[in-house]
C-alpha cells in the first residue's frame, strides 16, 4: 500500500462508515484515485462459467451497488466486477446506521437491506459502461415488500440481462426477512427455473450464478448442489455474509446484520470445499469471504474455487488490494509449478474437509 492510499484510508476511517463508502465511490468516479490498470498473465487468465477473465480476482457485490463507478473499477486490477444487488423497484433499505467497522477483527457488519436505485436505472448505467476485457455482472435481488420474490429475480434479469456479462441470484442476504428461505430445495428449484427461462431468451449467453449463505448444514449444501447441477446454472458463489459472531473482539460485534471480512474466511472456505466435493468439479465455484491476501485467494482456489471475490478487505487495505493479490497469486502459482489457475483448483480441498 502506497503513502497516498494509506493517508486516504486513515481519513476515511475517521468518518461514518457509510459516508466513507460513498466518498470512496465519488473519488473513483472523479479520477482522484490512482489505478494500476489491467493485471493479467498466461497463468492468471482463466475461464469461469463461460466468462473469460484476465485474472480470477473479482469485486464482490455490495461495493458499487448502483453501478456508478464502473469505468474506474475496470481499471483497478480486478479480473471481473459484480454490481448490485438490483431490485425491480428502487428501495431505501434499512434505517441508518446500518454499516459498522469491526477494526480489531478486520471485519464489517452490514444490514443494508438491498438499498439501490432500482433495475431500470442500474441497467441504463450498465448499458453505458465502457467495454473491455473485464466482465461486469449484476447481483439480482428482490424487493422487501414483494408478494413474489422469486418473480423479482427473473424480472431484474429480464430487464438487465442484455447489458450484463453475467448475473448472480442472491438468495443469501441475511438482511431481507425470509429471503434465505428461498435456498430450500422446492423454492430454489422453482426460482431457478424461472430465471433460466428468462436467460434462454437472450440473444447472447449470460451465465447465471447462485450465491449462497455460509450458515448451512451439510444436508442443506447437498440439496443446493443437487438443485444447482440440475438447473443449468453456470456456478455457485460461496459465500455471502454470516450471522455467526464467534470470537469477535470489536465493540460492534453484536450489531444485527451480516458479518464479512477476516472472521468469515475459514467458515466460507469449508463451505466452498464441501460444495467442491459435492459437485465433483462439475460446477465452477467462486470463493468469497475473508480474502485479504494472495495467500488467502490461493487457499480458496486450492479448496475448490475457480475464482475469488473480495470487498471488506478493501476497507482496510485500499482499492489497490486487488492488483496486489492478483500479482501475488501469479507468483504463488509459479512457485508451485502450476501453469494456470485451473490446474490449481481443488488441489488442497482435502485440507478443508477434516
From Swiss-Prot:
Entries under HAMAP family matching the protein: DHO_dh_type2
Binding-site positions, FMN: 61-65, 85, 139, 170, 211, 239, 261, 290, 311-312
Membrane topology annotation: Peripheral membrane protein
Protein name: Dihydroorotate dehydrogenase (quinone)
Residues binding substrate, per UniProt: 65, 110-114, 170, 175, 240-241
Subunit organization: Monomer.
Recorded catalytic activity of this chain's protein: (S)-dihydroorotate + a quinone = orotate + a quinol
GO cellular component, one term: cytoplasm
UniProt-annotated location(s): Cell membrane
This protein's record includes keyword Cytoplasm: no
Cofactor note as given: Binds 1 FMN per subunit.
Biological or metabolic pathway of the protein: Pyrimidine metabolism; UMP biosynthesis via de novo pathway; orotate from (S)-dihydroorotate (quinone route): step 1/1
A Gene Ontology molecular function term of the record: dihydroorotate dehydrogenase (quinone) activity
Family: Belongs to the dihydroorotate dehydrogenase family. Type 2 subfamily.
Pfam family, one: DHO_dh
Enzyme active site: 173
Domain of life of the source: Bacteria
Gene Ontology terms describing biological process: 'de novo' pyrimidine nucleobase biosynthetic process; 'de novo' UMP biosynthetic process
Organism: Cereibacter sphaeroides (strain ATCC 17023 / DSM 158 / JCM 6121 / CCUG 31486 / LMG 2827 / NBRC 12203 / NCIMB 8253 / ATH 2.4.1.)
Top EC category: oxidoreductase
Summary of the function given for this chain in its UniProt record: Catalyzes the conversion of dihydroorotate to orotate with quinone as electron acceptor.
EC number: 1.3.5.2
Key words, A-Z: Cell membrane, Flavoprotein, FMN, Membrane, Oxidoreductase, Pyrimidine biosynthesis
Cofactor(s) required for function per UniProt: FMN
Amino acid at each position: 500500500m502506497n503513502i497516498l492510499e494509506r493517508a486516504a484510508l486513515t481519513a476515511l476511517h475517521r468518518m461514518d462508515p457509510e459516508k466513507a463508502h460513498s466518498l470512496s465511490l465519488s473519488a473513483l468516479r472523479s479520477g482522484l484515485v490512482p489505478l494500476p490498470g489491467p493485471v493479467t498473465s498466461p497463468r492468471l487468465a482463466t475461464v469461469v462459467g463461460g466468462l473469460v477473465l484476465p485474472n480470477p480476482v473479482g469485486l464482490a457485490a455490495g461495493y458499487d451497488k448502483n453501478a456508478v463507478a464502473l469505468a474506474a473499477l475496470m481499471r483497478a486490477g480486478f479480473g471481473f466486477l459484480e454490481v448490485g444487488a438490483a431490485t425491480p423497484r428502487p428501495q431505501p433499505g434499512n434505517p441508518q446506521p446500518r454499516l459498522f467497522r469491526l477494526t480489531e477483527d478486520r471485519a464489517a457488519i452490514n444490514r443494508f437491506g438491498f438499498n439501490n436505485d432500482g433495475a431500470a436505472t442500474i441497467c441504463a448505467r450498465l448499458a453505458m459502461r465502457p467495454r473491455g476485457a473485464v466482465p461486469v455482472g449484476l447481483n439480482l435481488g428482490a424487493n422487501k415488500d414483494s408478494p413474489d420474490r422469486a418473480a423479482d429475480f427473473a424480472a431484474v434479469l429480464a430487464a438487465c440481462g442484455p447489458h450484463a456479462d453475467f448475473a448472480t441470484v442472491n438468495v443469501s442476504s441475511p438482511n431481507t426477512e425470509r429471503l434465505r428461505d428461498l435456498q430450500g430445495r422446492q423454492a430454489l428449484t422453482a426460482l431457478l427455473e424461472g430465471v433460466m427461462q428468462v436467460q434462454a431468451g437472450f440473444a447472447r449467453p449470460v451465465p447465471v450464478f447462485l450465491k449462497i449463505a455460509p450458515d448451512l448444514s451439510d444436508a442443506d449444501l447437498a440439496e443446493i448442489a443437487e438443485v444447482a447441477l440440475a438447473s443449468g446454472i453456470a456456478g455457485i458463489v460461496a459465500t455471502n455474509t454470516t450471522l455467526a459472531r464467534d470470537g469477535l473482539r470489536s465493540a460492534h460485534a453484536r450489531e444485527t446484520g451480516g458479518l464479512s471480512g477476516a472472521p468469515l474466511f475459514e467458515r466460507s472456505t469449508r463451505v466452498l470445499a464441501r460444495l467442491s466435493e459435492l459437485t465433483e468439479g462439475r460446477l465452477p465455484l467462486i470463493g468469497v469471504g475473508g480474502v485479504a491476501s494472495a495467500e488467502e485467494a490461493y487457499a480458496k482456489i486450492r479448496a475448490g474455487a475457480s475464482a475469488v471475490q473480495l470487498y471488506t478487505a478493501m476497507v482496510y487495505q485500499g482499492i489497490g488490494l486487488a492488483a496486489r493479490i492478483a500479482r501475488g497469486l501469479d507468483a504463488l502459482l509459479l512457485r508451485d509449478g502450476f501453469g494456470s489457475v485451473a490446474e490449481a483448483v481443488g488441489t488442497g480441498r482435502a485440507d478443508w474437509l477434516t
